[in-house]
Structure formats: structure tokens, C-alpha cells
């Protein structure tokens, strides 16, 4: 099978998948038990996204080296804006079901359409470094005003409920996502620019903000992503690889003293991480997983649609893989996992030898790992978009399939 034919088949499968996704939601809307008109618009935007990606694929032989990186970073820029909106308007999002999907439409719709126009109009002037600088400075401004918006007071928060109240609903989760994105972008700019001192303040502020917010999922995912990058990037040098493995073992062995030291300065995240390590506290996720297994067993083929999953906490079980199976059923869920997770990791690993790919590689692994403990459907949807663009880029550079 030729590479072009293989591309067409994969993109056709992607469009078929999104078509099923959209059609299923419309059918549910027409026959009752509907999510809402907002959700229908959300699926329609996803379908339009797939069509745009398919049209880009028609010219995949002519795609330039950094077009994927531009697409990816522009979508991530929209993702940062979405997290900021969630952080500011968290109480309104929590009181009105489905309102939060308006921001998802902004992420997918604006991200893809802005990327498309950018590629057509200013592809000669827009590169990953400039986009990272834009994300860095906007993120730096957001981080500076976060304490005033969220009234974040780490000294008076001792449990998850207080943490969520201080973060205004979804605020603490949004803060962590903004902080982690700022950390990754800042490290990327430090690695790839001569004026490294410009990006050190943003890195330090982002680390403080991420720790102060107290949400552990995004932070753990970042640690996993960084070690994954270091291990794979050192695979050709046995001494570097041994050094990374020794550091990883040291972190594992001394994890409790490290967390106790962190607790002195950031009591919320330190306390919650100690609960996770010492008592295996999962904030009730084990109960949600058992419920998810039962629901998947009862309806393994069709699933329950995105907004109709009858979970105790609403529409998700805080596990990206199980969320996908709940929403789509096992057959379509396996296709989503193959494209969004497996192909993403292969694509990211293939780019690890060059430091200019630090941001997209670490961001890819971070989003994948974070979706395993957070809002799986939204993050997996983003992974799916990124993977399609990444596959186009990767195949334009290699004959491997």
C-alpha cells in the first residue's frame, strides 16, 4: 500500500469516526435524552475539523517541516485561553450544564481555523519559536494575576473542598494546566534561545503557581512526561541514560522526605501527594472505575454518548481510557485509543532527538498522561486532533508507516 493511499484511508477513518460521533449526538437529540444544542454544535465543529485536516492531507507531500508544530502550538494557545476562561467563570460553568462546552468549541474551532488561515497567509513568518514566545508572555501575565482572580490562599487550605472553593470551582485545575503549559514552554525557550534569562522568571512563577494550586493530576503527569523525555532522549548515550535512571530511582526512594519538605512551603499539594503515596488515596476514583466497568459491560458496542454517561459525578469517571469506552463503546473506543494515544506516542518518540521538539513532545506526553486522571474526553479529543496533524508531519519526513 502506498503512503498516500494509507494516508487517505486513515483520514477517511478519522472523518468516519467524527461523523459517527456527530450523528450519534444528533440522533440522541432527536429521539430524547439529549445533551443539548450546545453539544450538537460541539460535535459539528469536530466534524468540520476532520474535514479541514483531510483537505490539508491532500497536500501532505508539500507540507513544510514545522507546519505541524505551528498547528499544535496554535491549538495549545487556544487551550490556554480555554483554561483561563474556566478559571475566571468557574462558578457559572458549574451552575449551568453544558456551558463549559462553549469553551471547548473555542478550543477546537478557533484553534483549527486560526491555524489554517495562519498556514495560508503567514507561514513564512510564523514559526514554533515565535508562537512559544507569544504563549509564554501571555501565560506569564495570567500567572501574575491568578492570585487576585482566585483569591488563592495556600496557608488556609487543608483539604480538597477548601482547595476547590479557593480556586472557584474548576479554578485550581485550570491554574495547574496554565502553570504546566507555562513551565513546558519556558523550558523550551530556555533550550532554544540565547537570551535564556528572559524566560527564567516565568518558569519560576509557573512552578510556584502550579504547586500552590494544589491539584496533583497535572503535576504528576508533568513529572512523568519530563522523565519520559529524558529517558528516551538519552537512549543512545549509556552514561546519560544511567544518570537519568539513577535520578528517577532517587526520586522514588526519597519521595516521602521530598513531599514532606514540599509540605512545609505548599501544604495543600504536599498533603494530597502524601495521601496518594502513603495511603493510596485516589479521591474516589476507584469507585468510579468500578461503576465504569459495569456500564461498559452493560452496553459494550454503542456506549452512552458524551453527555449521557450515568456516572455518580456526571458524565465522566476521571479516566481518559474508560471515558472513551463509555462514550463510544468498545469498537470505536479502540480506534480512538489507537489514533489518539498509540500513534501520538510513536510520533512524539520519533522527534525526541532534537531539542527544538521539546515543547510538542513533552506536551504530547503530558496531555496523554493527564487525561488518565482528569477530564478524559476533552483531553483525548485534543490528542486526537494533535495526532492527525502530527501524523501528517511525521509522514512528510519519513517513509515509515
Predicted regions and their residues:
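N-terminal signal-anchor transmembrane segment
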Residues: 1-58, 74-87, 147-148, 367-369, ...
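Transmembrane alpha-helices of multi-pass inner-membrane enzymes
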Residues: 14-18, 184, 359-370, 376-401
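Aromatic-anchored transmembrane helix interface
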Residues: 41-46, 68-83, 92-120, 134, ...
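Hydrophobic transmembrane alpha-helices and their immediate junctions
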Residues: 58, 130, 328-368, 393-399
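Membrane-interfacial helix-loop-helix modules of multi-pass inner-membrane proteins that assemble, modify
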Residues: 84-99, 130, 137-175, 264-272
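Alpha-helical transmembrane segments of multi-pass inner-membrane proteins
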Residues: 129-155, 170-232, 365
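A membrane-periplasm/extracellular boundary helix in multi-pass inner-membrane enzymes
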Residues: 147-148, 233-275, 294
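Long extracytoplasmic/lumenal interhelical loops at the membrane interface
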Residues: 274-329
